[in-house]
């Protein structure tokens, strides 16, 4: 099983391409952006995800933890010049220097987390060699890393290393040659061979002093019978540990519980696994994250297929009127058989349970309808 750390924007794509048996840890330094990151990953629907809100230095205690680290490091943003005039006005040689130093600090902080033989993917959205090739040379020389070549097609029009006197592989996506804005990446391997989960001892020593969570935890207000009722909402409930926090329940893959414990020892966890439900009175109110999750048992709830206009109204958190034949109680709304979220149908109206902070605010809507041929987990 592998553990991957991804910083910021590449997280949903990373989760899509990671092999089975992988855990993604997605970190965002800025707190309000970490909430947006959690929202995006919730909508993506995979349970093998932990979202954190930490400075890279906070990861230093997780020695030899990650198999792969993808760093989308803060940069001077020269690749944004074409579409963002503000990026041009904010650029300066001094800012390049600040970014260059920050990038090296980030790599220094997270390098101990990478397992021996692990992979570091370094990326920026800027052009200058100081923040790109010069930093790759520095990582190579400072940490003994091997810069790895990638298999690419000449049809992609990727530009290589631009640093004079160096020929290590690097990849530039320049906007006049490739589709998209400016982008740089290089891939490096940490020297050595991993000898397994060397962080396991750290977990055991920390767990001695922590309060129990999940199985065996104190769960005031939630009985075992109430908790077991939630198992029916999952396609394969035995794969998950149901974790109670007050009246809220989340589910996390059992295969990654040791990793979660290690992360909790050092980091601020914004979200882990799937938000399942909140106990209100004697009834469970399903969380929106459950509707989005590929772990959902689709037969656990009554369904109501709705049209495009109703779907937009729902996502704007407006009132939704269901058909007279729609069942009462909690109903899972679908559009083209894809789950949108829950409502509570009380007959004369359906209470919209879509998260208030996620609602569509823009008045613009695309004219066409997006067709999704298949959705895979």
Protein language model features and the residues they cover:
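Short, small-residue-biased leader/transition segments that mark boundaries at the very start
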Residues: 1-7
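S-adenosyl-L-methionine
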Residues: 29-64
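Class I S-adenosyl-L-methionine
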Residues: 66, 119-122, 127-250, 255
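Conserved SAM-binding motif I beta-strand of class I
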Residues: 23-28
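Mobile active-site "lid"/loop adjacent to the S-adenosyl-L-methionine
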Residues: 32, 67-108, 125-132, 157
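Conserved SAM-binding loop of SAM-dependent methyltransferases across substrates and taxa
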Residues: 8-19
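Polybasic, low-complexity RNA-engagement segments
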Residues: 191-377
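Helix-to-beta-strand junctions that scaffold the AdoMet/dcAdoMet cofactor pocket
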Residues: 19, 114-116
